[in-house]
Amino acid sequence: MLERTYIEDVTPDDDGEDTTIAGHVHELRDLGGILFVIVRDATGRLQVVAKEDDTPDLFETAEGLSSEDVVQVTGTLEASDQAPGGVELAPTELTVVSEATDVPSIEISKDVDADLSTRLDERHLDVRKPSTKAVFSLRSKAMGAMTDWFYDNRFEEVDTPELSTAGAEGGADLFPVVYYDKEAYLSQSPQLYKQILVASGVDRLFEVGHAFRAEDFGTSRHVSEIAMFDVELGYVEDHHDVMDVQEESLRHTIRHVVEHAQRELDELGSDLSVPEADFPRITFEEAREILADEYDHVPEDDNDLDTKGERLLGEYFEEQGHPAVFVVGYPDEKFYYRQDVDGDDVASRKFDLLYRGQELSSGGQREHDIERLTAKMREQGVEPENFEFYLDAFRYGVPPHGGYGLGIDRLIQQLAGLDNIKEAILFPRDPDRLEP
């Protein structure tokens, strides 16, 4: 390994210390006899000050540098009020590790916006921009914190197939794949496998994986390949137990980001605070009443909210100090595995979590009685015979259970304050993009 200190670990308190850094040449400024070289690594930027009178050979090497060359620099740290971050490096050794042979097609060192399509085409360059790199550093810290919360609370991580003979949610938005001599599809959701595992005795589980939706869309909220954080737990009394888990884990995640990713938040200009108060839990009917009474907005679909409705509900509750809100009791007409509310022919124990005006997750209590489950499948036009691998798990005693699937990409979009979900994904996939 090349000897180096990460730039984020360098502080003015290190004045007088010798150190070595390595990274890309972010910016060059020649003042005649003094050359300022801003070096950028994965954690930050540090100013290197080369002086012709002090180190003529090194200065000559520095004069030959180009933007994005990879360098290794050894020298003495000097505290300076004029330097970015209050400290700079007086170099004694400068090695060019790798030369940049082409001029980058994207401006990396300056705050100049390229259109999103160009940024995604040149993602290997775009990720070098500090603002883009901050998104994925934040994402890494957020998902590490969320995963840790589930490990600490006795959940087990599982892996389920991303190839299957049928989709958990049915419909036409499945990607068919060639699988030997059989018909197969990319996974819409690990839902059926999560329930099979709960029935098998793995009663607190989570999975970080991908789901695929063959939908033709053109919005800032959708992509074809989705990163998901799926959760399922057994022995629940009702869907509120599931919401409790999601609320506590999300609050922990946001707190970790606020405490450990402030550099990234500052780079992104995202003003993030921890939602300490309980997340409000309102019924689906109450949500529609708020939209009608406060905003004169009525979603066209009587059984769902629309994008505008979610945004308006976000504004309504953020004004009251609640960036997150659960909407509970959606009409039960789409998914056979969701449990109905006793004595109510319409509502289900389904919920959505809205955060900063966007749906992050859907979840609820599942149906664990095989007779009711089979009847609901037939009511919704699903042939139970095609899901025998799933139904067989319910013949041997299944605890009441529930869970949810959280869209990781949407969560990062909201934490980072991004306009488009594709900005939160390293290599997004949509109907028009299959590379890089």
Curated annotation (Swiss-Prot):
HAMAP family: Asp_tRNA_synth_type2
EC number: 6.1.1.23
NCBIfam families named in the record: aspS_nondisc (TIGR00458), PRK05159.1 (NF003483)
Alphabetical GO biological process terms: aspartyl-tRNA aminoacylation
One Gene Ontology MF term: ATP binding
Organism, scientific name: Halobacterium salinarum (strain ATCC 700922 / JCM 11081 / NRC-1)
Assembly, per entry: Homodimer.
Cofactor: Mg(2+)
Gene of this entry: aspS
Enzyme class label: ligase
Domain of life (superkingdom): Archaea
Residue numbers binding Mg(2+) 3: E359
Record's protein name: Aspartate--tRNA(Asp/Asn) ligase
Positions annotated to bind Mg(2+) 2: E359, S362
Region of interest: Aspartate: 191-194
